[in-house]
A protein has these predicted regions:
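Short, flexible loop/turn elements at secondary-structure junctions
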Residues: 89-93, 103-105, 118-121, 151
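General secondary-structure edge motif
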Residues: 4, 23-24, 35, 69, ...
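Charge-dense, low-complexity intrinsically disordered segments
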Residues: 11, 35-46, 180-183, 187
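Non-catalytic accessory segments flanking enzyme active sites
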Residues: 22-102
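N-terminal hydrophobic targeting/anchoring segments and the immediately downstream early-domain regions
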Residues: 1-35
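Short low-complexity stretches enriched in small and charged residues
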Residues: 8-12, 44, 165-167
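Cap/lid segment of the alpha/beta-hydrolase catalytic domain
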Residues: 109-202
Length: 202
């Protein structure tokens, strides 16, 4: 805010932030220029493939082997027009994912499947507003799989740690460990969802 009054002297307090901000702005300007140059579907598909490749590389890849999901149903709640099935599956060996599967009680052939990825709430799939959304979808004839992200719902990883809270704090704590190992925690979040799609289509 006061940079124009520095008379070409440096402001070390904000220098790193300003450098990073400048890089972000440069990147956004470049991206806008590249998007404006895309004229055909083929060019768009080529650009999309390039972005996808770079993104997957940036998180350390998604080159896991698809193991058996080892699906377990731990209970169900019959709500009349639909049933909620409590599900546990493994996205990787020993890496458990908890979810609720909402299924209409009257199914005639194949039905659409919705993967519901929960936002930042401690109860995750049990959050009332997320349940309401899933119920609206199942009442309209769709199967809905609501999945707990790591660090939320039944997947709180460090419940006995007073210095690491649920959600973003856990994500950051586990994410730092991943970064130190040369990878990104996002690959595990994404892989859980990829395997959730496998579950939905099985």
């Amino acid at each position: 805010m006061f940079d124009r009054f520095l008379d070409n002297y440096r402001n070390p307090e904000n220098e790193l932030a300003n450098l990073l901000y400048g890089k972000v702005i440069d990147g956004l300007v470049k991206e806008e220029r590249i998007k404006a140059e895309i004229k055909t579907i083929e060019e768009w598909e080529e650009k999309a493939a390039h972005i996808r490749k770079k993104f997957i590389e940036s998180i350390g890849g998604l080159d896991f082997d698809k193991c058996n999901l080892n699906i377990e149903y731990t209970g169900e709640i019959d709500q009349g027009r639909y049933t909620i099935k409590k599900v546990v599956f493994q996205s990787l060996p020993g890496f458990y994912v908890t979810a609720n599967l909402y299924i209409p009680n009257e199914i005639d052939g194949k039905i659409p499947g919705i993967l519901f990825s929960c936002g930042h709430s401690k109860p995750a799939k049990a959050e009332p507003k997320y349940q309401r959304a899933a119920i609206e979808l199942v009442l309209n004839g769709m199967a809905v799989l609501a999945v707990d992200p790591p660090g939320q719902g039944e997947l709180i990883q460090m419940p006995d740690r007073n210095d690491v809270d649920w959600g973003v704090h856990e994500h950051s704590y586990m994410g730092l460990a991943c970064s130190l190992a040369g990878m990104n925690i996002a690959r595990y979040f994404i892989w859980n969802l990829i395997r959730a799609v496998d579950f939905l289509t099985s």
